[in-house]
Amino acid sequence: MKIIFPLLYFLFSLLSSCSNGQDTISLDGINCDIHGDANPNRPEYRLNEFKNRYNFPVKSDYDAGITLNDLISSGDENQFPIDKAVILTGYVFNVKMGGVETCNCKTKDERYRDTHIELTPDDQHTGAEYRVIVEVTPRIRTIMAVKGIDWSTEELKSTLIGHKVKIAGWLFYDEEHKAQAFATNPEGERNWRASCWEVHPITYIKLLD
């Protein structure tokens, strides 16, 4: 699978027309809306709205000035607007199943959980301090499946790890991980990511090698 999702802006607009009706979806038999099952009085109730976006960015949504290195180094949750999208190029260090989260109504079914892709600048800089998390969500995965594109965790794992890619999607700052990110907790012994900045959800992936 050389090109997972070609013709960037054309297909963004094409797929946008197919992304209606995703406010509430069935995850393992559970009707899960864009807030997931978060408590309305908790911060994740609002944050889940951003995690569960399913509209595809159009050209005017993109901030071409934001780079992968910017996301790696930023510990400032206000540095970038999360209503903007980015296009990034990097090396895929790892692909794995996301955890059990309120955004997906705490489903344990792997088919309905996020896919975490660990993106680094290149194959020489793959330590946790360089890893930016970019995520495929169940809603976007479903839209892709309708178009005949397989964005399951297993498919992405088998095709992306060890390759250079171009990805695009919405910016997100996942404040829940401040204690595990080098940009906000430089001395953390259990850090596993560069910063809290993510691309979440991803709406485009293309293999470059």
Where do the PLM segments sit?
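Positively charged n-region of N-terminal signal peptides that target proteins for export
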Residues: M1-I4
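C-terminal motif of bacterial Sec signal peptides marking the signal peptidase cleavage site
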Residues: S16-S17
